Each structure stands twice: as C-alpha cells, then as structure tokens.
Amino acid sequence: VSVVRGVGLGLRWEFLDDLVQQTDNAGDSPNARGAGALPIDFLEVSPENYMKRGGRYPAALAWLAERYPIVTHGLTMSLGGTDSLDAEYLRELAATIRAVRSPWHSDHLCFSVASGRVLHDLLPVAFKEASVQPIADRIKAARDALGVPMAIENVSYYWHPGRAEMSEAEFLARVCEAADCGLMLDVNNAYVNSLNFGFDVDRWMADAPLERVVQMHVAGHEWFAVDDRGIGRPVAPGSAGGMVIDTHGADVPDPVLTLLARVVKRTGPVPIVLERDQNVPELAALLDEMARIRATVA
C-alpha cells in the first residue's frame, strides 16, 4: 500500500471516524480495495497531529495505513529558521514515517521557530542568495535523519522580510538545486500570493523548478476586508482593498483549478492533494470535490 499517485485527501480529524467507517463498509483490506471502495487514491497526513499521542486517533491512522497509501507532510520543521533542528522531533517523525511507509516527506520553506519559541505560523524567508545554502543544508540534514527524500512547499505569505534579491520561484529553484530535493507545489498558495502582490502567476510557474515537483496541493481561499485595524469581515472575491487569505476554508475555486490544469500539462501526472482545514464539510462533499480535480487533470 505504498504507491502514491492520483488524487488524495489531506486527513483531518473532522472526518476521520467517517472515513474509517466507510472504508470498513466497503470491505477494504490490507491486500485489496473492496468493491465499494472510496475514490481516494491516497491520504496525506501531518505526523505532528499523531506523534506522542495515544488513543483512537493514532490507532485509526495505523488502521488506515494498512488500506491506503500514505504520504507525510510536516508543519513545524522550520527549514528556513536558524535554530538547530530538533533531534527528538526528527526521531519521532522518522518513526511515524516508517510506520505509515511514506515514500517521501514534505515541509514548508519557511521559519516557524525563533530563539526556541514556536511561532504557530509559517513565515516567509528572505529570498536572498545568502539564505540558499544554509536552508539547503538543513533540508539535507532532515533527509538524512528521516531516511526518505525531502520536498519543500511554497507558502502563502502576507508580508515579506527585507529586500528580495530574486523572485520566490527563482529562490525555490536555487534551494531545490542546492539541496537536491523535490518541490511540493502548492498551486493555491502561488495563486493567492499573485493576487495579493500583483505578479503574473504563469510567469511564476515558468520560473519555478517544475521538473522537481513530486506532489501538489490545491485548496480554497477567501477574501477579507482590510483597514487600519487589520483584517476584517469576509468580502466578495475581487473586492477593492480586499486581501486574499489562504484559509483552506472553501471549495477550490475555478481559477485555481484552471491554473492546476496548465501546470499539469508541464509536469505530467503527479500526486495531487485536496486540503481542507476550515468549514470542513461532510466526507461526501470532499469526495465530490476530488472528482472535480480528477476531471480537471484528466
């Protein structure tokens, strides 16, 4: 159960029990999918949600790992930070990766830890030449500790530290080359950033190292009003003065699916994950959305 391909679903607790029940009802076993198997090609799991945790969630993950291919996607490695990588975290992460038999591990090209403090956010790094090799060295150290190939994800951001020496896409290419790692391309993140910062997302894709893409993410986003007090109420898409937030709280919009189709023409078939973290609907609705994604890249 280790081939990761097609269209997968980011596993979330909101529908975990339903997924287990429906998978069991379909008669799926460790060796064969049942006649009524769910149209889920694989699952993506964030190990931090299961590490050092007892009870039904890790047990459910172990059960699902015998029935679906699983790939892991991290949240807290802080590859763009300067704090030392957490050795205990890497040991726990490696054990989880082995347990679910993930063929690679991805995490975000960002910093989320500073001076030992977890920032609970995925903050952008400076797109400077001096940052390339230190980040690449951290990616290679993580790869060696985990025992599987690494891939880095482009993040959404709403501010940027310092003056950039290159575009984000060029920076991703430099880091991937220096680290000899894969790219976990988040199509929605690139689209959201293009709206907020006014750049051409197709040019961004032309500069990105698409030859290194091993996996993609798609998700929904939402528009919010912005004023002197900060981010306010939701507004209609395209509203003047609005900001687009990568909430993972809505269906994947048509422009993101259209962009996905253009990108897949260049990359060829790669595993695609649907992410949903806010306003999570019933599993049936997520399966319908996955069908839209399949139709888009068919």
Residue positions per predicted region:
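Acidic-and-aromatic substrate-binding clefts and catalytic sites of carbohydrate-active enzymes
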Residues: 16-17, 46-57, 78-88, 158-165, ...
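Active-site acidic/histidine proton-transfer and metal-coordination neighborhood
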Residues: 86-183
